[in-house]
């Protein structure tokens, strides 16, 4: 089922969700960090630093810096690929799944509050 939003409603939804996250969450993620987290959870694995860098059109060091933060928050984990030591595999964590479940609930809640 497609959801129809006017541009002003979509922007208000983004504003309200982000405002709540900044005010209430201990984990203040950047747009890049959130995009990486959502990519790892919503798209089928495997996920690698190289693959994420290509998908997001950013450098591998930029992905690595974001993963340092996300790993420190225990939202994602990473390990060397045993088959190819050059690759680093990015994996999901329980804390990351819980964070995104909360985020999904928050988006749904704020969408219901939008003026019609």
Labelled PLM ranges:
Residues 83-101:
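Basic, amphipathic "hinge/linker" alpha-helix immediately C-terminal to the N-terminal HTH DNA-binding motif
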Residues 2, 6, 94, 115-116:
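Intrinsically disordered, low-complexity regulatory regions
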Residues 46-88:
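Canonical helix-turn-helix DNA-binding module
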Residues 1-27:
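N-terminal leader segment of winged-helix/HTH proteins
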Residues 19-58:
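N-terminal helix-turn-helix DNA-binding core of bacterial DNA-binding proteins
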Residues 21, 101-116:
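Amphipathic alpha-helical dimerization/coiled-coil segments
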């Amino acid at each position: 089922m497609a959801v129809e939003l006017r541009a002003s409603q979509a922007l208000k939804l983004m504003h309200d969700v982000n405002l709540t996250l900044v005010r209430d969450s201990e984990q203040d993620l950047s747009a890049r960090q959130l995009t990486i987290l959502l990519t790892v959870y919503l798209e089928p694995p495997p996920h690698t630093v190289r693959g994420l860098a290509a998908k997001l059109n950013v450098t591998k060091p930029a992905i690595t810096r974001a993963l340092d933060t996300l790993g420190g928050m225990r939202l994602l984990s990473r390990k060397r690929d045993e088959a190819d030591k050059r690759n680093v595999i990015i994996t999901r964590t329980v804390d990351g799944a819980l964070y995104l479940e909360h985020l999904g609930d928050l988006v749904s809640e704020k969408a219901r509050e939008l003026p019609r």
